[in-house]
Amino acid sequence: MLLHIGLDDTDSPNGMCTTYLGALLYRELSRFGEPVDLPKLIRLNPNIPYKTRGNGAVSLTFDILEDYLNEAKELVVKTVKKLAEVEHENTNPGIAFLEGEVPEILRRFAIKALREHVTIDEAEKIAKKAGAEIVKLKLGRGIIGALASIGYPLNNYTYELLAYRKLENREKVRRVDRDSVFEMDRKFYPFTYDNVDPFKKTILITPHGKDPVLVGIRGIDKGKVLLAYENVIINENVEMIQLFKTNQSTDDHLVWKKIGDIKLYDNVIVKGKVASKYWERGRHVFFEIEDETGKIRVAAFEPTKKFRNYVRKLLPGDEVIVAGGVKEHEGVLTINLEKFYPIKLVPKVEYRKPKCPKCGGTMKSKGDYLKCKRCGYKMPKVLIPVKLPRDLERKIYEVPPDARKHLSRPLVLPKSEDKFIGPL
């Protein structure tokens, strides 16, 4: 009998990680049956305000004899109750069990949980219709992700290898050799990616909190991901490693929409015209985009660093495609820019004073006429239009690795442009 197990909302800023629980159970459940595939790490809607750290849920699928089903479920519940950060006010774990094949209604629910806002009440109704068993701890908000991780149709996927720390090391600085990570990246990029930030000269595979994760290496080839890990020098004991199949770096969260159809917490791709000159507030860069159905604000926030320089080059009238998650900023619906593509740029024209026709000197404006600073020649005030280069190419611009969302697909990966500019 196939038993699908989903877990979510077990962590907090103080520690724990749902992937760690998944990796533990992947080993423990092997005494009851055979795993059908690698565990799945499913990232859900990154815009939801009460999400866990990375809004990631985990699911496991095992082929288990019916005699062991109840024992396997009891083990899962016992482990989650023991290790989840239930003391934290915002941690509300959820567990889901489904026996047999995954029904279509659960697949549709998973896609909705990826792209839109879903309530606990909706999840409970879907569980009943799908024949899934749910276990709620506290508010049990985690049942949303638990059910979605089981139902998620992982047609597009990448891999992530996670190495976990021993309990006694989790309050200490992670001891990972920086130079070895850069060397690993040189060897295996782009089959593994987002390992380092080449501009800041920092490594990105190590998180910073008290959670159990020591390093995480992402890639599109599981063999190369494993080899990449072997090339990293780690100066502390590792409890275990686990390879996950995941929807990270797939762009599956993004949906083409007209501006008039956009809702709070959506993840959208929008085609339109720049409707305003950019403005800045608090190191964030903003502009507006419009189509025939409406207008919406777009933001390149401070963590995107040099990416903001490209946004500053956009001019009113430019035709562009933008992509990102929709949140409220200063009470206004705003697309948090992940990438953009200039389709058609308006000419950039600057009006300049001519040189003096007598001596070639510089002309100075004097009300309604011009006067040469060198020879004093006067002439009517006529400015000459000069077309300036735009300094933007017809290509996709993306945020830097350390500002990238888990779900956003880096341009270095195959088919990274298909969803974004394929429909043009």
Swiss-Prot record:
Pfam families: TiaS_FLD (PF08489), TiaS_TCKD (PF22641), tRNA_anti-codon (PF01336), Zn_ribbon_TiaS (PF23783). One of its GO terms (molecular function) is nucleic acid binding. GO terms for biological process: tRNA wobble cytosine modification. It is an enzyme of class 6 (ligase). Residues 268-342 bind DNA. It comes from the Archaea. GO terms for cellular component: cytoplasm. Its main location: cytoplasm. This is tRNA(Ile2) 2-agmatinylcytidine synthetase TiaS. It comes from Pyrococcus horikoshii (strain ATCC 700860 / DSM 12428 / JCM 9974 / NBRC 100139 / OT-3).
